[in-house]
Design a protein with these regions (language model features):
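Mid-chain, well-packed structural core segment of small domains
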Residues: 60-98
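Short, charged beta->alpha transition segments
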Residues: 53-61, 107-108
Length: 126
């Protein structure tokens, strides 16, 4: 995960658009994937579901007590979260749902509007 000031947006905001390898939010454009939390939106180097590891998702596990729900947008297609990752989310008592990035962005925006304690890992769609 990038350090503050390096691929960091300092608050939780809706995602306005996604595609072409990035996202638009907060009046700016970002190329690449994102980790979104109540304390901000971070650049995230993951580019495919093959790169989803416990280490890649560690920022979510570290913030589990600050979240009620975590979304994983895995790109264009639906996918099943591997058992080892589901188990890790269970171990930290954090509900998780895996879906295509578009669905995750829409769900993020709805949960944010409801003022829910939500986090998301969003893999950029080409």
């Amino acid at each position: 995960m990038a350090e503050k000031g390096e691929g960091f947006y300092p608050r939780q905001v809706p995602i306005d658009a996604y595609g072409n390898g990035g996202f638009r939010f907060g009046g700016m454009s970002h190329r690449g994937s994102l980790l979104c939390f109540p304390d901000g939106i971070w650049a995230w180097p993951v580019t495919s579901i093959a790169e989803l590891t416990i280490a890649a998702l560690e920022p979510a596990f570290a913030r589990a007590d600050q979240l009620d729900f975590f979304l994983i947008g895995g790109g264009r297609d639906p996918f099943v979260l591997p058992d080892r990752l589901r188990k890790r989310f269970r171990d930290v008592s954090l509900s998780v749902d895996a879906m295509p990035t578009g669905a995750a962005v829409r769900t993020w925006n709805v949960l944010l509007a409801e003022r829910r304690r939500v986090g998301a890992a969003l893999i950029a769609v080409p």
